[in-house]
Design a protein with these regions (language model features):
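Short acidic-glycine-tyrosine-enriched beta hairpin
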Residues: 89-104
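Histidine-centered metal-chelating micro-motifs
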Residues: 60-63, 100-111
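A short glycine-rich, His/Asp/Glu-containing loop-to-beta-strand
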Residues: 37-64, 69-73, 122-123
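Glycine- and acidic-residue-biased ligand/ion/polar-headgroup-sensing regions
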Residues: 68-87
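Ligand-binding loop in jelly-roll beta-barrel domains
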Residues: 78, 105-126
Length: 127
């Protein structure tokens, strides 16, 4: 899959974050990213099919454990993130501006370990 350059991004191949397969758990309303980390996750559109989140994680900030259903994240800038999973394992991930990433619906905490604020759009699938 290729991202088409329509908003000033260089086309970038998509990726699937390779999270630990035993790290996830079903999402509950108690671990909704918007409720757990309202300073970082804002709903910008919601309908029967999707919920779109504007994500801004300040440099050095860390979210509590939360979940997303199956989702696509689009990076609006270069990012270095540390994901921690319920099983205690963690993974550092470098993402590039314009990169689209498939998230297969699991729980995690995220820490911005980069040199600037993280800005992304997350499209959560409801169906």
């Amino acid at each position: 899959m290729i991202i088409v350059d329509r908003v000033g991004f260089e086309p970038t191949t998509s990726a699937m974050l390779k999270f630990y397969p035993d790290s996830g758990k079903p999402m509950t309303h108690h671990d909704d990213a918007v409720k757990v980390a309202p300073d970082s996750y804002k709903v910008v559109l919601e309908n029967d099919a999707v919920r779109v989140l504007a994500v801004r994680i300040k440099q050095g900030a860390k979210s509590e454990m939360h979940s997303h259903p199956k989702s696509v994240a689009i990076c609006l800038n270069d990012q270095r993130l540390k994901f921690t999973f319920p099983n205690g394992k963690s993974e550092d991930t470098d993402l590039k501006r314009g990169q689209a990433v498939w998230l297969d619906g699991l729980s995690h905490a995220v820490e911005n370990v980069g040199n600037e604020d993280v800005n992304s759009v997350v499209v959560e699938l409801k169906k």
